[in-house]
């Protein structure tokens, strides 16, 4: 009885740990992703003038941001690519990057951020 309880506990702990399963393990193991060069995310939006910032977020300087629209559908393809990507130039907010004038986006969503407004950077207070 004690042996089966111990086996159940070990299986439970194994299930709760962060494992690298065969279908989602990057080449070289879990830590290999940290060594890869980060590529620019896929183009999206009208004329491919935007970049993906999340699975349903497409932003561009000339376009603004499309969230959950047909223009952002291509961004779902990022989920199937093996290497990480990054869009935007300047970091902002909590783990986000400047996506368009005055807008900061992370994979979870977008919000207004004065740090991303190029005109605010040059204005005098």
From Swiss-Prot:
SUPFAM superfamilies for this protein: Neurophysin II
Q: Which GO terms describe its molecular function?
A: neurohypophyseal hormone activity; neuropeptide hormone activity; oxytocin receptor binding; V1A vasopressin receptor binding
Gene3D superfamilies named in the record: Neurohypophysial hormone domain (2.60.9.10)
Where in the cell is the protein located?
Secreted
Entry GO CC: extracellular space; secretory granule
Q: Look up keyword Nucleotide-binding and say if it applies.
A: no
Its assembly, as annotated, is: Interacts with oxytocin receptor (Ki=1.5 nM). Interacts with vasopressin V1aR/AVPR1A (Ki=37 nM), V1bR/AVPR1B (Ki=222 nM), and V2R/AVPR2 receptors (Ki=823 nM).
Function comment: Neurophysin 1 specifically binds oxytocin. Oxytocin causes contraction of the smooth muscle of the uterus and of the mammary gland. Acts by binding to oxytocin receptor (OXTR).
Tell me the protein family, please.
Answer: Belongs to the vasopressin/oxytocin family.
Q: What is this protein called?
A: Oxytocin-neurophysin 1
Q: Which organism is it from?
A: Bos taurus (Bovine)
What gene is this protein translated from? OXT
């Amino acid at each position: 009885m004690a042996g089966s309880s111990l086996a159940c506990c070990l299986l439970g702990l194994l299930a709760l740990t962060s494992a690298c399963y065969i279908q989602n393990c990057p080449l070289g193991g879990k830590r290999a992703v940290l060594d890869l060069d980060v590529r620019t995310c896929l183009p999206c939006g009208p004329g491919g003038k935007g970049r993906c910032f999340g699975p349903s977020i497409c932003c561009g300087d000339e376009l603004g941001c499309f969230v959950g629209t047909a223009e952002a559908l291509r961004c779902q393809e990022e989920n199937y690519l093996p290497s990480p990507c990054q869009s935007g130039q300047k970091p902002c907010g909590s783990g986000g990057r400047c996506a368009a004038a005055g807008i900061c986006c992370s994979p979870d969503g977008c919000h207004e951020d004065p740090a991303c407004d190029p005109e605010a950077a040059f204005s005098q207070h």
